[in-house]
């Protein structure tokens, strides 16, 4: 069994080992700095793949583009599977990898949204099974911390200029018009777009109500979830001029918040809708500052709604998105591949 080692790869490896499956992990990590280190790492990966693919019974790729690039090295009769995360198979990203995906014995998708998008495209496609990733951040049995008073918002995402879809700008515009009230926004994550966002916060007069925490380790991230009472991440799902898409393939931060007993504010379209249910576990809104501000005002006016929706989010997360369920789903999916 082979797959690319990423965060999901570690969860998959644990699930497979728990079910008694022998696993070999291959990845493309660098072997030194710069282009030379990257090239050496890729060359070693390809050599290991060429050797190992002739000694395994099944190959699982965690990236459609990677599968396409290595297919010439694979034995023709080697059954292969692929995991679909989201944007890498939406819109103009799909045609270059479509043939490789059609040659797979089976596909797994991190959300029903991504599965539906793929099946809406001309096929035929292999069977596509939805398997939601688990929230590895929280040790099993961790009890949720009490909710803080007021409105304590948290956003967890990279601050990359190339990924301005996570909703930071929407939140700044919404908060600028929220008015008085007991609220604060913590922004976790770092990247080259941070200076621009900080300047926007200052220009909107929100400097004393917004904290940029930068990149944090897991302990600090758990504390951030415990200090908030609403995960605010209205990620935009939209098509770029070149035909590529932005949006959440699943959105692990929504699940991490739910396990912590925190409700979420999200947009209506994207993989996060598998988890966030409007009026039950959070708010699903249109991608406008007006809609985001309206949801925030509702949360401020009715603090009990944060507790109710947070408790419902935790219950749903533990029942339908837990690690045991993930392990069982992976085992059942692989067993069905023959």
Stretch-by-stretch model annotation:
Residues 277-290, 298-304:
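Conserved acidic donor-binding segment of nucleotide-sugar-dependent glycosyltransferases
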Residues 103-141:
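Donor nucleotide-sugar binding/catalytic pocket of nucleotide-sugar-dependent glycosyltransferases
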Residues 254-259, 263-266:
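Short hydrophobic beta-strand element within catalytic cores of glycosyltransferases
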Residues 226-247, 262:
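Acidic donor-binding loop of glycosyltransferase active sites
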Residues 209, 298, 305-320, 326-332:
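A short, well-ordered alpha-helix in the C-terminal region of glycosyltransferases
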């Amino acid at each position: 069994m082979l797959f690319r080692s990423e965060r999901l790869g570690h969860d998959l490896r644990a699930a497979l080992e728990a079910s008694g499956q022998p696993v070999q992990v291959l990845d493309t990590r660098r072997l030194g700095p710069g282009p030379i280190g990257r090239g050496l790492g890729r060359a070693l990966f390809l050599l290991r793949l060429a050797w190992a693919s002739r000694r395994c019974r099944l190959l699982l790729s965690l990236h459609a583009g990677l599968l396409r690039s290595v297919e010439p090295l694979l034995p023709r009769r080697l059954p292969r599977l692929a995991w679909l995360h989201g944007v890498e198979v939406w819109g103009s990203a799909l045609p270059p990898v479509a043939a490789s995906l059609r040659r797979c014995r089976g596909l797994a998708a991190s959300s029903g949204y991504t599965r539906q998008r793929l099946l809406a495209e001309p096929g035929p496609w292999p069977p596509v099974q939805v398997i939601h990733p688990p929230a590895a951040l929280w040790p099993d049995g961790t009890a949720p911390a009490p909710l803080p008073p007021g409105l304590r918002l948290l956003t967890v995402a990279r601050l990359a200029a190339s990924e301005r879809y996570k909703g930071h700008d929407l939140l700044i515009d919404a908060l600028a018009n929220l008015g008085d009230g007991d609220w604060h926004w913590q922004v976790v994550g770092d990247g080259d777009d941070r200076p621009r966002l900080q300047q926007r916060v200052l220009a909107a007069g929100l400097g004393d109500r917004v904290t940029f925490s930068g990149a944090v380790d897991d302990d600090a991230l758990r504390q951030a979830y415990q200090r908030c009472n609403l995960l605010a991440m209205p990620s935009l799902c939209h098509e770029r001029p070149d035909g590529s898409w932005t949006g959440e393939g699943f959105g692990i931060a929504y699940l991490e918040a739910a396990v912590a007993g925190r409700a979420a504010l999200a947009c209506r379209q994207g993989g996060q809708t598998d988890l966030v249910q409007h009026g039950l576990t959070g708010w699903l809104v249109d991608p406008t500052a007006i809609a985001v501000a309206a949801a925030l005002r509702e949360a401020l006016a009715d603090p009990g709604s944060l507790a109710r929706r947070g408790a419902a989010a935790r219950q749903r997360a533990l029942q339908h998105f837990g690690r045991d369920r993930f392990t069982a789903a992976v085992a059942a999916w692989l067993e069905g591949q023959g």
